[in-house]
Amino acid sequence: MLAACSSRAPRPVPEARAVDGGLRLLGAAAYPAGTLTLGDGPRFGGVSGLARDPLSGQWVGAIDENEPQRLAWMDVAFGATLTVTPLRFTVLHAGPGASAETMAGLELESLVAMPGGGFAATTEGYHDATDIVHQAEVVFVERDGTVTGAVRPHAHFAMTAGDRGHGVRHNLGLESLTRTPDGRLISGLEQPLIQDGSMSNTTRGGLVRLIEFVARRSAGWTPGREWAYQLEPTAVVPGFSSPCPDGENGLSDMLALGDERWLMLERACLLGPPGTPAYNPVKIFEVSSRGAEDVSRLPALAGRSLRLVKKRLVLDVDTLLPRLPPLWATGSNFEALAFGPPGPLGERTILLMSDDNLRPTQTTAVLWLALP
């Protein structure tokens, strides 16, 4: 185990201005590639989902790499400068309720802690190199890495081989997951289903589906209602000419503030001049599903007039960058969102962590923010 060195401490930052108030920065850190390690094992990084294990108090990250597919356990010391200490990896393995198809397609993207121990996670769906389809699922994992089962969304999410004319887009499916106070799981697509319309671009954001999964005594977990959520357009930033591959603005994680109120984390990836880091515009929105229509019976959304989930901006992370250390100059690829410990004034807080894609040019960054 190696405790990681951190970036220099950020200076205090005033609360970001947004409609009806926003989030306040409490602490931050950014770790260059290779500075978070665990002995001779796989490099720590690629964190795409984050949850606090209530039994140990440790933090658990879903690693977006499938060789091997694993969870990363860590300690986080909270303050103006956050300190992340990797502890161990837990490799996932099949339990009696896990199908061979589920195990073959594991590529974790988001993570939530479940009552009584264990986790739920999403695997977003993709085509492998031989065009074998691995469908998007929510999977259930014990603390020791045992995969105990999975549930899939409705049939209109199903991917197709060959022409790819229906369902989840390759590697752009169930990217986010949260658990509501009433016990439902809510997941969201990173980009629209193929039949629902175009991906985000610089003039219009894509229309993605949010879907609930409900635990029913007789049938286990089943898909339920769906809502339509409008993404923001991909940002236009001087000096960054085009999106990264699949880097248009998308939904990367979500967090339930209540049964119908959720925080949504949107981010994009923009390419700069050759040899320079990519730029990651990141925004957090508060949304409400109250009054939004259930679209679960609609196989396609393109061209329809719909009552959408309502949203309002609570933080544009770009407003924080000028007062953070130089390592933050082009933002970070934030994909993980979880509740943090109580803040200095007893307020609720959230913790963001970025996915460095296990690349030498990217960082693992963390932000600790107070809710208003």
Regions found by a protein language model. Give the residues of each.
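Sec-dependent bacterial lipoprotein signal peptides
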Residues: 1-3
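Sequence/structural signature of beta-propeller domains
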Residues: 5-372
